[in-house]
């Protein structure tokens, strides 16, 4: 199976309120389109467990191949993206998580503060969920590592 559909979920109260522009989400959408994906959904949601769970559930049920969740990977009181993602992922790709960390550390010592995870919702296929910290640099690093391997991930998942 060749993955073709993607969704971008940005969890950020400051973007939702208009205090900050959605530059990381826009970059993610652009990178996904450049990689040949159809971005069917690009939403900004409030931070917090329930909102992230609801948005992920909708994309997984829709059969979206690649779901990028930006934000909520720190240790703040509303940062639950990794915990929610963990409930959906059955095959975690810790090697890719490490590659993303190493790539991020080339640019910023803060890369190690992200708790983002990457994994498949089903060992036989399903959706690939990618967590990224909310900076443009983090999104570029994360997708720069993962996107070249998406075809291999889905081929191996068969």
Could you describe each region identified by the protein language model?
Residues 1-158:
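Non-catalytic beta/alpha edge segments that cap or flank active sites
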